């Protein structure tokens, strides 16, 4: 089966007026060595969201010379997102919730700021409220033109901020979030989260301002304002977005599912199914398979590298639900991969 579902049911509307949104932001904890591989170096992680956005929309990057890569040279999962969306031709839009580097393209800005180090406090409370409220207004506006949203994300180290938010909201999440690396740096993540949740404010917005990254607030706001159905396109981070949404409007979860990849489902170092069940939200997973790829840089997805990001799972699910096969997606991904790796040489 090309798409599997867990924790309940969720139907993507037929002939829906659909929009793909990429919400970008940065957090200063991505600068901590060893925490994330979503960039060739810790410093370059602040360029990754802007570069992902540029590649998704334009097929090339200008804020850095190449597409974002891991330290061992594996390119961004945006190549999967772009490949999948080429089959379905739905509009794509970038929303900046608080990225330190801005992409060179038209976008919608939520008036946010880059996230700081969550051990000291991610955002000022008024900034967190502004991101959330502007997201709600944007979601309401999207309701006038669309009835289905796919919301992807790009924020290096976002699984750590997601863990902090989930723990701060009372969920058992310390050993359950994923990583872009096959070696999930769990002990480092836990150390950061333990420090972050000390002296936590008692009110909800106070907690979110301390722990959340701007992306989670932007995604949650858009979802809260939107009237139709939503696929939160991402891995364990999106369980944190769903948990935030639930805090403000529990009934909204009936219109929402997480859309991810089989690589996140199969990740033994995390538990997205358990997290989603605790929050009360279904998961759809694109059962992509790159085993037979002619490129080693794509085969390594089957070994636990990268796994998800930039809405790769959600975009693939949307394409597969419209009859696109794994082989077609892989063929298009290989075409893009060949082009970008030729440029990398």
From Swiss-Prot:
It comes from the Archaea. CDD domains: DMB-PRT_CobT. One of its GO terms (molecular function) is nicotinate-nucleotide-dimethylbenzimidazole phosphoribosyltransferase activity. Belongs to the UPF0284 family. This is UPF0284 protein STK_21430. It comes from Sulfurisphaera tokodaii (strain DSM 16993 / JCM 10545 / NBRC 100140 / 7) (Sulfolobus tokodaii). The lineage of its organism: Archaea, Thermoproteota, Thermoprotei, Sulfolobales, Sulfolobaceae.
């Amino acid at each position: 089966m090309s798409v599997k579902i867990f924790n309940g049911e969720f139907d993507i509307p037929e002939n829906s007026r659909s929009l793909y949104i990429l919400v970008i932001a940065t957090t200063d904890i991505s600068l901590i060595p060893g925490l994330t591989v979503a960039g060739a170096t810790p410093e370059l992680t602040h360029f990754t969201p802007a570069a992902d956005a540029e590649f998704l929309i334009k097929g090339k990057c200008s804020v850095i010379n190449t597409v974002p890569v891991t330290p061992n040279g594996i390119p961004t999962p945006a190549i999967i997102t772009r490949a999948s969306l080429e089959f379905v031709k739905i509009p794509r839009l970038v929303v900046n919730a608080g990225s330190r580097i801005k992409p060179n393209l038209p976008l919608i800005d939520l008036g946010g700021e880059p996230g700081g180090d969550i051990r000291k406090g991610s955002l000022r409370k008024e900034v967190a409220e502004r991101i959330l409220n502007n997201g709600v207004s944007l979601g309401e506006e999207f309701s006038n033109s669309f009835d289905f949203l796919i919301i992807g994300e790009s924020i290096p180290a976002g699984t750590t901020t997601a863990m902090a938010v989930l723990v701060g909201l009372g969920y058992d999440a310390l050993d359950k979030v994923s990583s872009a690396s096959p070696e999930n740096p769990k002990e480092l993540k836990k150390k950061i989260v333990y420090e972050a949740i000390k002296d936590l404010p008692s009110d909800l917005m106070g907690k979110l301002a301390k722990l959340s990254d701007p992306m989670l607030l932007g995604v949650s706001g858009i979802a809260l304002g939107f009237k139709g159905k939503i696929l939160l396109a991402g891995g364990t981070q999106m369980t944190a977005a769903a948990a935030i949404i639930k805090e403000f409007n529990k009934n909204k979860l009936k219109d929402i599912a997480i859309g991810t990849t089989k690589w996140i489902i199969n990740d033994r170092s995390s538990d997205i199914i358990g997290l989603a069940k605790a929050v009360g939200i279904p998961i759809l997973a694109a059962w992509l398979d790159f085993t037979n790829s002619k490129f080693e840089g794509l085969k390594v997805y089957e070994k636990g590298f990268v796994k998800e990001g930039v809405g790769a799972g959600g975009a693939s699910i949307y394409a597969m639900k419209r009859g696109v096969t794994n082989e077609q997606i892989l063929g298009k991904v290989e075409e893009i991969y060949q082009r970008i790796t030729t440029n990398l040489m």
